[in-house]
Design a protein with these regions (language model features):
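Short, glycine/acidic-enriched loop or turn micro-motifs at the edges of active sites
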Residues: 12, 39, 64, 106, ...
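Active-site glycine-centered loops adjacent to acidic/histidine catalytic or metal-binding residues
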Residues: 9, 36, 61, 121-122
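N-terminal active-site segment of His-dependent metallophosphoesterases
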Residues: 1-44, 141, 163-164, 185-186
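Short catalytic/metal-binding and nucleic-acid-binding patches
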Residues: 17-19, 58-61
Length: 186
């Protein structure tokens, strides 16, 4: 089984990043980076990208301007990305898991009424409590959010799944969404 990891807001090259996040994670193989990978200018960004191992999937953030010139270092680059992860890829799943990846948090997203989970960065942990208390299924995977702190760095899909299952009380995401968003469909 391949482990799937998510992160955002690494801000490589930011002058204050080590002061605020001395133990920030570094990307591994097959990671989804939800924006703000680097503050480096174009040539320094290229040098950083050359050193990162494995396949990377970039959802662009507001500080990724210089990185757009180097999209060849990523398997995909996009503004928003919808994923479906199947139990055959991750045996801990009991059903297909739909994810929407975006740098910014959203109030509504594709497939939300059908149980999709929304992963974001940008907020530097400031929406963790809101995400926890919301009936929705958004999660901040930024390097300084509570999920990253709990995981010790990169946020594994398994932790997102477990946290979301706790939030739904063990009800499938599809049924949870039907109960919370689509009462007219019951």
């Amino acid at each position: 089984m391949n482990k799937i990891f998510f992160t955002a807001d690494l801000h490589f090259g930011h002058t204050n990043i080590l002061k605020h996040q001395p133990n920030r994670p570094f990307a591994q193989e097959g990671d989804y980076i939800l924006g703000d990978l680097t503050f480096f200018k174009s040539e320094d960004a290229r040098h950083l990208l050359e050193k990162l191992p494995g396949q990377k999937f970039l959802v662009q953030g507001n500080h990724d301007g210089s990185i757009r010139a180097y999209s060849n270092y990523f398997k995909t680059t996009s503004q928003i990305l919808d994923l479906t992860v199947k139990p055959t890829a991750c045996p801990f799943l009991s059903e297909n898991l739909m994810l929407t990846l975006f740098h910014y948090p959203m109030l509504t997203w594709n497939h939300k009424p059908y149980g999709s989970i929304m992963l974001h960065g940008h907020c530097h942990g400031k929406l963790d409590e809101h995400n926890r208390l919301s009936n929705d299924l958004p999660f901040d995977v930024g390097s300084d959010g509570e999920l990253a702190k709990k995981a010790g760095g990169l946020v594994p899909l398994e932790l997102i799944y477990e946290t979301a299952m706790e939030k739904t009380g063990g009800v499938s995401f599809h049924q949870y969404a039907k109960n919370n968003y689509r009462s007219e469909v019951r």
